[in-house]
Amino acid sequence: MIKFIRTLGFKKPSNPILGMVLAGEVDSVGKDVKSFKNGDQVYAINIRQFGAYAEYTCWPESVIAKKPSDVSYEEASSFRYGGLIAWYYLKKGNIQSEQNILIYGASGAVGTSAVQLARYYGAKITGVCSTANLEFVRSLGAELVIDYTKEEATKSGEYYDFALDAVGKRKNSNNWSRQDK
């Protein structure tokens, strides 16, 4: 017996194809697309539509960007994810010039974007990362960098106007922020 859900079609798959972040090559474009052509190397994030893990997918022009030629597909696929998450939380935190902020996990995809965006906003940045990434995080714009393998960021006695945990391992980051005092 065949069970029809709708008169004019079949039921959607119960497990849609996953993925909101992609990097690849444009195979074809619609007649109204202005920014891309066949063969363009691109990367994208689409928080409203899954399907990035499919071999082919169709996404709106507004969520796609051209991939720089000196960047791999793997690197490009991480650009928008880290940047979007960092931007969202810094915007939500209403970061202002001269504020003192802490970025825990400053060397990952979200953290590196957060350091650069916070620098753009004019904030004073303390980054927390491992020994291997201290100079890298400093080069992104952090004024102070704490090596979490040697020092606990919460023990410094410093208060921050905003703290971003880009790792997700802190049980309680409220003790870092004036917003919670």
Report each predicted region and the residues it spans.
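Structured loop/turn residues at beta-strand edges in well-structured enzyme cores
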Residues: 37, 62, 96, 140, ...
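A structure-centric feature marking long, well-folded core domains of fungal metabolic enzymes
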Residues: 36, 67, 101, 117, ...
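NAD(P)H dinucleotide-binding glycine-rich loop of Rossmann-like/cofactor-binding domains
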Residues: 11, 20, 44-105
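Glycine-rich cofactor phosphate-binding loops and adjacent beta1-alpha1 units
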Residues: 126, 140, 144-181
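Glycine-rich beta-strand-centered segment in the early N-terminal region that forms part
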Residues: 3-48
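Short, well-ordered alpha-helical microsegments
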Residues: 35, 111, 134, 153, ...
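Mid-domain Rossmann-like dinucleotide-binding core that forms the NAD(H)/NADP(H) cofactor-binding site
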Residues: 77-150
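Short, acidic/turn-prone active-site loops that include or flank metal/cofactor-
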Residues: 48, 70, 131-132, 149-153
